[in-house]
Amino acid sequence: MASGENQSSSDNQQRRWHHIRKLLERSGPFCHPDFEPSPEILDFIMDSCKVLIVGAGGLGCELLKDLALMGFKKLHVVDMDTIELSNLNRQFLFRKNDIGLSKAKCAVEFVNKRVPGCEAVAHHCPIQDLDEGFYRQFHIVVCGLDSIVARRWLNGMLMSLLQYNDDRSLDQSSVIPLVDGGTEGLPEHCIEYVKVIQWAKENPWGNNTALDGDDPQHVAWVFEKAQDRAVKHGISNVTYRLTQGVLKNIIPAVASTNAAIAACCATEVFKLASSCCANMNNYMVMNMADGVYTYTFNAEKRPDCVACSNSTRIVEIEPDATLQMIYDKLCEDPVFMMKSPGITTVINGRNKTLYMSSIKSIEERTRDNLKKKITDLGLYNGVDILVADVTTPNTITIKLKFLENQDVEMAR
């Protein structure tokens, strides 16, 4: 009897991977040039390939489910957040009893139980708390974050792990591909927030009245509140018709959009891990506002990119400018887009902190420097300033160039 059960289990496993094996064990016109069909590729995906999923929210739940069902067993999930009531309508791995618990831990526990053989591991912490050694162990990183700051930091971390040969060529073995997915600016989010959160708190008809998507007064109230929230967060296209559709579950756009984007990301992870098909080059947009529209294009790299360029970053500034002007430029300039930069320099061989907001005592001590002219602080044409920010794990060196001295060779 036991032998028969084992045979049945083995047969089920073979059938489970039957269609994936067709992709991995035979060639085709869209395969990567380095692809060699082999049954060992599936063994690598299942037993060796380590994938880090950053974020366990709407996208992260879908990614974890998709990758586990694709055969990836060595999955790690990192998320610092806990589960809230408003998450339950689109983050399907969570239940009402999970409210207040770790997203990463609950998601991993759910998938490990439902997908045989999955060995997912949860990390309930900020991504900044994990060191280089942690990130270096993964073959691929895929993220579903709603924070631009966190996405930029993660990109910077993976860039910092790159190694170079003696001839300054990139060591390809040090490259950890990043598949970056995101959904943002959806008007449905505003409606769902009012439906799940604000209705319970501000229901003008009393706590005993249930929200009715067929009641024009209820729909109008939700529509008005959703519009207010949309204006506050710079989101458009909240309409009465859309409000009614979301309330009656006719338009499950948030959940379906997350599922579609996660499926695209998971497919890219599979392609990177197996080389069974050329990977995307390199950016895809999906717009589901009016039907479904997708567009894939090659996003060009800036030659002076702050994250990956080896060129010296130069900031042009008036010599009578204040440190506040440099601070504002670092925050507002599209090249940098920093959040709270800390600025230091080296003067006469000694480190000097000009301004740093991340540490309260130093911020209080250096706050007055923001009002001072940069020349009064010892900065000169051609000087290097060192800038640290939450958007990058590394310090960035920037050379100041005084505008009135454009024809004068900068000091070295």
Predicted regions: what is each one?
Residues 1-412:
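Adenine nucleotide-associated cytosolic modules
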